[in-house]
């Protein structure tokens, strides 16, 4: 049985994230979506809100669970007994960044990373950009689920 961890800040959850989760669910026996904190960004949602949003949008995927990740990724992977880390990549910049992080996780935690290229339709989706345009009332329904839109609207009133 191969267990994978898909870590991220998911602030907000996008259709690109959901695509990586659903594709991972087909590839691995168990997928843990690990909700971490990105200290270099200001979060719009709490960890609990993110867990609820992800859980509600993945409830049809029986081999997917969602947990908070209070630690470094390689430590979390070890603590849940996972075999690999999964990351989505949209472009060359993502690849270079993820390759470097994968090397660190391998050296420190002896864990491999599987990189899933984004489908073309999701390559331009950036959580940071979506938060910014949503603050000004732009329609982001092509990029995020409806429950995410509702929560963004509540938070940006």
Swiss-Prot record:
Cofactor names from the entry are: Mg(2+)
> Mostly located where?
cytoplasm
> Location of site Transition state stabilizer?
17
GO CC, any one term: cytoplasm
Any one GO MF term held by the record is: pantetheine-phosphate adenylyltransferase activity
Q: Which HAMAP family match?
A: PPAT_bact
| Protein name according to UniProt | Phosphopantetheine adenylyltransferase
Protein source organism:
Oenococcus oeni (strain ATCC BAA-331 / PSU-1)
